[in-house]
Amino acid sequence: MKIKIKLKYPFQFEGREISELEFRRLKTGEVRRATHKGDEMQTAITVAAISSELPVEAIEEIDAADFHEISEALGEAGFFSHTT
């Protein structure tokens, strides 16, 4: 299962404009590797990077409002349980 999210604020990364992201469900081991003790924001960034198959550096370029929407949408869709 995958989910597509259209960004309100597209961004540039490695010379291309990114206006929509696609996320896949995570495997248990991926969630474990993404979890950063005591740092929920870093965990959320890593989860987004793994599930979108983009580097962390790309995820860090996402507008904060879009990132909040992404976190909410992935949580509501059951892609991961309270890693953010």
Features from the language model and the residues they span:
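Short, surface-exposed, charged amphipathic helix/loop patches that serve as local interaction elements
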Residues: 2-84
